[in-house]
């Protein structure tokens, strides 16, 4: 029996009244696309309407924190504020220290961003040692050895927006 992974939610959350932003990097696009698709499908199953899922891109994972902040601000300025945002990126270790620097700085920046934007920022950054690990965590490896983590991020987005979003209190 596996003990890892997201546990079952304490209830089913209705996402029909929330607006979700997804901002994703373009590096490792096959994996990114699968993760985004998983998040969208899971949110749709929880009632989030397709027209309330807004998608934006940035070049790479390092650009996610700044891009996310600007994305959130722009939606608010347009009078269509988001309730939650999911930055999605995939980092795969190579032979240099690049992986460590980008993983660490991006993780901390995304964590700190929640206070700046005053909304839940779901951690959608895969940090994998190999391409095979990334494919597995996107649910697209040949053996289908794992589920798509994008589904977890979509479920977390709905739960956090409903429980703790601006309209929750």
UniProtKB/Swiss-Prot annotation:
Binding-site residues for 5-amino-6-(D-ribitylamino)uracil, renumbered to this chain: 27, 61-63, 90-92, 123
Q: In which pathway does it act?
A: Cofactor biosynthesis; riboflavin biosynthesis; riboflavin from 2-hydroxy-3-oxobutyl phosphate and 5-amino-6-(D-ribitylamino)uracil: step 1/2
| InterPro entries from the UniProt entry | LS (IPR034964), LS/RS (IPR002180), LS/RS_sf (IPR036467)
Q: Which reaction does it catalyse?
A: (2S)-2-hydroxy-3-oxobutyl phosphate + 5-amino-6-(D-ribitylamino)uracil = 6,7-dimethyl-8-(1-D-ribityl)lumazine + phosphate + 2 H2O + H(+)
Binding of (2S)-2-hydroxy-3-oxobutyl phosphate occurs at: 95-96, 137
Question: What GO cellular component entries does it have?
Answer: cytoplasm; mitochondrial intermembrane space; nucleus; riboflavin synthase complex
User: Where does the UniProt annotation locate this protein?
Assistant: Mitochondrion intermembrane space
Q: Which terms are listed as keywords in the entry?
A: Mitochondrion, Riboflavin biosynthesis, Transferase
Q: What induces it?
A: Is constitutively expressed at moderate levels.
Enzyme class label: transferase
The active site lies at 98 (proton donor)
Q: Which GO terms describe its biological process?
A: riboflavin biosynthetic process
> EC number(s) for this protein?
2.5.1.78
GO molecular function (one): 6,7-dimethyl-8-ribityllumazine synthase activity
Q: Which domain of life is it from?
A: Eukaryota
Q: Which Gene3D superfamilies match?
A: Lumazine/riboflavin synthase
Subunit-level organization: Homopentamer.
> What more does the entry say?
Present with 3260 molecules/cell in log phase SD medium.
**Per its database record, what is this protein's job?**
Catalyzes the formation of 6,7-dimethyl-8-ribityllumazine by condensation of 5-amino-6-(D-ribitylamino)uracil with 3,4-dihydroxy-2-butanone 4-phosphate. This is the penultimate step in the biosynthesis of riboflavin.
The text of the family note is: Belongs to the DMRL synthase family.
Q: What is this protein called?
A: 6,7-dimethyl-8-ribityllumazine synthase
Source organism per UniProt: Saccharomyces cerevisiae (strain ATCC 204508 / S288c) (Baker's yeast)
């Amino acid at each position: 029996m596996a003990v890892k992974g997201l546990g079952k939610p304490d209830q089913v959350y209705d996402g029909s009244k929330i607006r979700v932003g997804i901002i994703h990097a373009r590096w490792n696009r096959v994996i990114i696309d699968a993760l985004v698709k998983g998040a969208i499908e899971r949110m749709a199953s929880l009632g989030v309407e397709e027209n309330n899922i807004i998608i934006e891109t940035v070049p790479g994972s390092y650009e996610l924190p700044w891009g996310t902040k600007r994305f959130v601000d722009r939606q608010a300025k347009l009078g269509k504020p988001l309730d939650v945002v999911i930055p999605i990126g995939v980092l795969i270790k190579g032979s240099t220290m690049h992986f460590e620097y980008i993983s660490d700085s991006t993780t901390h920046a995304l964590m700190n961003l929640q206070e700046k934007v005053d909304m839940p920022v779901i951690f959608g950054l895969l940090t994998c040692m190999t391409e095979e690990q990334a494919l597995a965590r996107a649910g697209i490896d040949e053996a289908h050895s794992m589920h798509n983590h994008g589904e977890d991020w979509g479920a977390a987005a709905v739960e956090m927006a409903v429980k703790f979003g601006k309209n929750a209190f």
